[in-house]
């Protein structure tokens, strides 16, 4: 009997020590409820296949039809429907820009997310999947397709915008869609109506959605050294039809008009998500991704909120929708904030300059900040030359910590190959979570202490 009790006690202690030594469960609060998003069309199909989800989805759509959030929250059926859908793929679904059923996907997304917040939000979450491509990918593809001129800044004397138009004409798809929107946007309807803006916008959307960015970016963000080049860049979207109007509407009215259309609303939300100025990042962009910002900017062309260069200055880059803040009344501060997201946006300005210069940011995951009493550990790294010009030259708050000359034949403007980076840390970031895990570190194990081992031995001895 004593031996049996001793064996049970020893087994219990052994299991306790094993549990202490085992890796922690991955289902912590950081990962609870996370699931990989699917596109909203597929999520709708999955929901329709489940009677509980489909019935709750119909209920929620009826609840949101009145657009009265307080009434919806006071209704128990509406609350129950929302709780069920928050656990379904519909709640986290996203869309892809240019996908076959993009409009249907966006309609499903906004049918759930519209009305869930009180009032109108200044910044709305983007319904699109995050962009993972980089500008360096665009440069590499441009070098493959064009053969020469992969770097937009190879020659300071050439008209890069003219070169971009020539490159487009060498591609059948680009040439066809460009000729189409030029013809439509230049077609005068009557002496009082210079063009059909609706058809012009549609043709522009087709061009920027269907032509690879290796061509469209070169036309839209080409670098210029003189006014003639800058004017050609400004004329890329045929602004007399697609952009300008007799009078400038109020910017908040223009935003409200845009938000009545699911596509326009989505493109504006995506622009804010990827281009909103952030002073916590190296590039002033939310995710340090110039490509994401430029893609979001180009995605707004062909809608009521269409932005463009405000003048033909080759030295300053200022873009804006065709609107002003006159007549804003007590909403003037909000209007100015909205407008400055275009006219005084360091993220967007840096992204346009980076493409024009043929450079991209080579980011390694951020290392812990250095102590004031310690110098950074950089071995024999050449100091940056005073004349080095990069995409951050106009950014007041951007300091490049790690810049590198592009591969695939790209060269820096001063023809000196330079690479200065701090030690790279390879990390993985779990989607939907801010938790950073080093892949080589593995799960951390808790070693059983010597005290626990001694205690188990003592208790076993007493039992015997």
Swiss-Prot record:
Disulfide bonds join 40-93, 47-53, 63-78, 95-105, 161-222, 168-174, 185-200, 195-241, 224-229, 251-323, 258-264, 275-293, 285-347, 325-335. A lipid is attached at residue 440 (GPI-anchor amidated asparagine). The keyword S-adenosyl-L-methionine does not apply. GO terms for molecular function: glial cell-derived neurotrophic factor receptor activity; heparan sulfate binding. Coiled coil: none annotated. Residues 1-21 form the signal peptide. Keywords: Cell membrane, Disulfide bond, Glycoprotein, GPI-anchor, Lipoprotein, Membrane, Receptor, Signal. It comes from the Eukaryota. SMART domains: GDNF. Its main location: membrane. It is found in: Cell membrane. It is a lipid-anchor; GPI-anchor. Residues 360-392 are annotated as: Disordered. The keyword NAD does not apply. GO terms for cellular component: external side of plasma membrane; receptor complex. GO terms for biological process: glial cell-derived neurotrophic factor receptor signaling pathway; nervous system development. Residues 360-374 have a biased composition (Polar residues). Residues 381-392 have a biased composition (Low complexity). Residues 441-464 form a propeptide. Glycans are attached at residues 52, 357, 413. Belongs to the GDNFR family. Receptor for neurturin (NRTN), a growth factor that supports the survival of sympathetic neurons. NRTN-binding leads to autophosphorylation and activation of the RET receptor. Also able to mediate GDNF signaling through the RET tyrosine kinase receptor. Interacts with NRTN ligand and RET: forms a 2:2:2 ternary complex composed of NRTN ligand, GFRA2 and RET receptor. Also forms a 4:4:4 tetrameric complex composed of 4 copies of NRTN ligand, GFRA2 and RET receptor, which prevents endocytosis of RET. Interacts with SORL1. This is GDNF family receptor alpha-2. It comes from Bos taurus. The lineage of its organism: Eukaryota, Metazoa, Chordata, Craniata, Vertebrata. The gene is GFRA2.
């Amino acid at each position: 009997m004593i031996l049996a009790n001793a064996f049970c006690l020893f087994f219990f202690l052994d299991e306790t020590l094993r549990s202490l030594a085992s890796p922690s469960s991955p289902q912590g609060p950081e990962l609870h409820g996370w699931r990989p998003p699917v596109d909203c069309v597929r999520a709708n199909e999955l929901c329709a296949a489940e009677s509980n989800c489909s019935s709750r989805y119909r209920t929620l759509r009826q609840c949101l039809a009145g657009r009265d959030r307080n009434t919806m929250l006071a209704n128990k059926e509406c609350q129950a429907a929302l709780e069920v859908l928050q656990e379904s793929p519909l709640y986290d679904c996203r869309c892809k820009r240019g996908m076959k059923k993009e409009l249907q996907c966006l309609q499903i997304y906004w049918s759930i997310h519209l009305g869930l917040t009180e009032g109108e939000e200044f910044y709305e979450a983007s319904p699109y999947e995050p962009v993972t491509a980089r500008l360096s990918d665009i440069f590499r593809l441009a070098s493959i397709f064009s053969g020469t001129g992969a770097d937009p800044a190879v020659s300071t004397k050439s008209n890069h915008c003219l070169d971009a138009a020539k490159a487009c004409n060498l591609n059948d798809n680009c040439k066809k869609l460009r000729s189409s929107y030029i013809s439509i946007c230049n077609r005068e309807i009557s002496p009082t109506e210079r063009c059909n803006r609706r058809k012009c916008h549609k043709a522009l959307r087709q061009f920027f959605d269907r032509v690879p960015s290796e061509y469209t970016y070169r036309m839209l963000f080409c670098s210029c050294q003189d006014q003639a080049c800058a004017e050609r860049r400004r004329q890329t979207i045929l602004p007399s039809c697609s952009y300008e109007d007799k009078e400038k509407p109020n910017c908040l009215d223009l935003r409200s008009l845009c938000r009545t259309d699911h596509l326009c609303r989505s493109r504006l939300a995506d622009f804010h998500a990827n281009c909103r100025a952030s002073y916590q990042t190296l590039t002033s962009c939310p995710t340090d991704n110039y490509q994401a910002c430029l893609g979001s900017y180009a995605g707004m062309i062909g809608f009521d909120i269409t932005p463009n260069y405000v003048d033909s200055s080759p030295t300053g880059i200022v873009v804006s929708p065709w609107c002003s803040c006159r007549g804003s009344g007590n909403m003037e501060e909000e209007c100015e904030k909205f407008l400055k997201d275009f006219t005084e946006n360091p993220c967007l300005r840096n992204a346009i300059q980076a493409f024009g210069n043929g450079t991209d940011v080579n980011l390694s995951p951020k290392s812990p900040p250095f102590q004031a009493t310690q110098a950074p550990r950089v071995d024999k790294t050449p100091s940056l030359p005073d004349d080095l010009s990069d995409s951050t030259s106009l950014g007041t708050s951007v300091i490049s910590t790690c810049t590198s000359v592009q591969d695939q034949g790209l060269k820096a403007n001063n023809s000196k190959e330079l690479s200065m980076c701090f030690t790279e840390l390879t990390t993985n970031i779990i989607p939907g979570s801010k938790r950073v895990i080093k892949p080589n570190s593995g799960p951390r194990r808790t070693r059983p202490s010597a005290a626990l081992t001694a205690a188990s031995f003592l208790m076993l001895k007493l039992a015997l």
